[in-house]
Amino acid sequence: MLMEDSNYTVTPKRRTPQVMDLRAVLLHPGLKCKALLMIHEECSTQIVHCDIKPQNILLDEYFTPRIADFGLAKLLLAEQTRAAQTGIRGTIGYFAPEWFRKASISVKVDVYSFGVMLLEIICCKSSVAFALGEEEAMIDWAYECYKDKKLDKLIENDEEARNDMKRLERLVIVAIWCIQEDPSLRPSMKKVTQVLEVVIEVSVPPSPSLFTSSPPSFKK
């Protein structure tokens, strides 16, 4: 059963109780990313959702994240890992780069959208506002803050986050890996889950838009 009014929207420059509730759930170390992991790896038919964003994440009565709105989803047949693209699907601000290259798509488009959403929740800023405005793209801004060791810029006025900068850094690193321009560099949701639960360590991410001849590894 889904909670009434249970979809929470990340709003720019504002930390409403709804936003904070969702942040508490998604940024909690025990989060298993189960909803997305399930449709990618645990269903009998693999599903690419194609429209992962905060508005499509619902919380049930136990505050467990559930995915909603499968209207744009693609089903992958047995042994199939990619699907032909029949036009861009999703929401501005969350599109993976391969949508614009007319390339075949995989579950990695959802991983990209998850990374954007994670950055939104960390920063309490909307990627859509960044995409429509004249400001630097949120993903580039977040990476620059990470590279320059200025993560505090991402969490202005968030004293709770400032009290655990090590945890914040892990979350930002995961998000940066998820938004890599090269889909082959993005981790699976299973690996994302393992890192968030501190089951495995994660390596230093490259620039999201940087292609290298020797791809780095997500796992240390």
Where are these predicted regions, by residue range?
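Conserved eukaryotic protein kinase-like
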Residues: 1-220
